[in-house]
């Protein structure tokens, strides 16, 4: 079915949905729209991932971070000057609402621990985008132990200024993937 969008006019939800179905094919679009993804850590990696998920049409995204936007974040994270001092969860939600207002966004302004991650029960995919190696390990071990039905995508060695050509994705085991350069340790970006 052909859908024409009037130039200069914001398309309706139905019009935008038809455009996305045509772009992805109905089967892929329906899978994306039904997806529920939690992004834990909304810094340089997590903020970019969340925005990409919203652009492709993932149906529900849970944004999780405890931090606020600082001036030092602006060179590598998806925030603007107007967001300085805001919770990263609220700032990123406002950005995603402008990109794709039809994505359901939930926010959790928390420091994630193994005691407070029951909310992950409601999602299909967990994306770990933390800076701290200890927090990465704790989250991954807890998810792998307590949420065996979830896909877990973790990061390793993604901070700093290194050769992006060496970044790869490895399947560690069923439903567990790590993306990174596998050479540099985790650290703040």
Regions found by a protein language model. Give the residues of each.
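A structured beta-alpha segment of the ubiquitous adenosine-cofactor-binding alpha/beta core
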Residues: 89-95, 99-123, 130-133
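Hydrophobic/small residue at the entry helix of a nucleotide-binding pocket
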Residues: 45
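Glycine-rich phosphate-binding loop and adjoining beta1-alpha1-beta2 segment
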Residues: 65-99
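E1/E1-like adenylate-forming module used to activate ubiquitin-like modifiers
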Residues: 1, 5-6, 125-189
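Hydrophobic Val/Ile/Leu positions in short beta-strands of Rossmann-like dinucleotide-binding domains
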Residues: 39-42, 63
């Amino acid at each position: 079915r052909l859908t024409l969008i009037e130039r200069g006019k914001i398309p309706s939800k139905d019009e935008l949905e038809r455009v996305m179905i045509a772009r992805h094919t109905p089967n892929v679009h329906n899978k994306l729209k039904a997806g529920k993804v939690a992004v834990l850590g909304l810094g340089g990696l997590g903020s970019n991932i969340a925005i990409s998920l919203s652009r492709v049409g993932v149906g529900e995204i849970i944004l999780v971070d405890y931090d606020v936007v600082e001036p030092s974040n602006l060179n590598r994270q998806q925030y603007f000057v107007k967001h300085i001092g805001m919770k990263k969860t609220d700032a990123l939600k406002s950005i995603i609402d402008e990109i794709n207002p039809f994505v359901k966004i939930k926010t959790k302004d928390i420091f994630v621990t193994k005691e407070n991650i029951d909310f992950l029960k409601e999602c299909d995919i967990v994306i770990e985008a933390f800076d701290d190696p200890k927090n990465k390990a704790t989250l991954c071990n807890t998810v792998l132990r307590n949420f065996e039905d979830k896909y877990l995508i973790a990061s390793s060695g993604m901070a700093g200024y290194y050769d992006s050509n060496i970044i790869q994705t490895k399947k560690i085991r069923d439903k567990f993937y790590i993306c990174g350069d596998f050479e540099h340790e985790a650290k703040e970006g």
